[in-house]
A protein has these predicted regions:
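C-terminal accessory extensions appended to soluble enzyme cores
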Residues: 1-32, 198-220
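Non-catalytic, usually N-terminal nucleic-acid engagement modules in DNA/RNA processing proteins
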Residues: 9-78, 98, 176, 193-194
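Eukaryote-skewed repeat-based solenoidal scaffolds used as protein-protein interaction platforms
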Residues: 49-50, 70-215
Length: 220
């Protein structure tokens, strides 16, 4: 029996998000369309409700609890998202100590929302999130090659151990997707990103909202 054949069935799986989607890989992750746009301004999801900075791209580099409501009720927020320049797909967490199935589920959720936004004429830059090598097989599935991708480095490279995992994951993603542009939310030191720039990849770096706020407090 399939869900679509059940009368008066509440769509608890949010199947409407992937209507007419094509899927990639054994996990059937929704595929996204190519996006080559380059954002010039970012705004966190939590601030879009009182903002008129519609020339910004919305990002989700925040605690999951802040934007879980988008997954719970995406139709409610669509008109607001459509006002802005575009969206970087949701950054649902992939912690290394999370069960792998939860990491896969969060990757699916991000892609499903991204696909749905694209079908509603919202430009979407895919966010790539990985944990350790277990997540490599699916972290970039469904993402077109040679486009623009986004990566969050905030909180991932300060600690030596975390930095190693980040570098390994980034290298895998770049080799797999061969992007033209990488949007980096957080610091983008040349020790990590320099070799990609030398190979012709454009790095577009944005300071994290935390670092911007902290620098203002320190300088005040």
């Amino acid at each position: 029996k399939v869900q679509s054949a059940r009368n008066n069935c509440k769509d608890v799986f949010h199947a409407f998000l992937v209507t007419n989607a094509t899927y990639a890989g054994n996990l059937e992750i929704p595929e996204l369309s190519m996006e080559n746009a380059i954002p010039h301004k970012l705004i966190p999801f939590s601030k879009i409700f009182r903002s008129s900075s519609y020339d910004s791209w919305i990002h989700f580099y925040e605690d999951d609890v802040v934007f879980e409501r988008l997954w719970n009720n995406p139709k409610r927020y669509l008109p607001i998202l459509q006002r802005f320049q575009g969206v970087i797909s949701p950054d649902f967490s992939l912690y290394r100590d999370m069960p792998l199935v939860m990491q896969q589920w969060n990757t699916y959720r991000s892609r499903a929302i991204a696909h749905w936004l694209q079908t509603n004429q919202v430009p979407v830059i895919p966010n790539i999130r990985f944990g350790d090598e277990r997540s490599y097989d699916f972290c970039s599935v469904g993402i077109p090659k040679h486009g623009t991708i986004s990566i969050g480095s905030h909180g991932c490279i300060k600690n030596k151990i975390e930095r190693v995992f980040f570098q390994r994951g980034l290298e895998y993603v770049v080799n797999e997707l061969m992007p033209q542009n990488i949007v980096v939310y957080g610091s983008a030191p040349s020790s990590i990103f320099g070799k990609y720039q030398e190979n012709g990849i454009r790095i577009i770096q944005f300071n994290s909202d935390y670092s911007v706020t902290h620098s203002k407090v320190v300088s005040a």
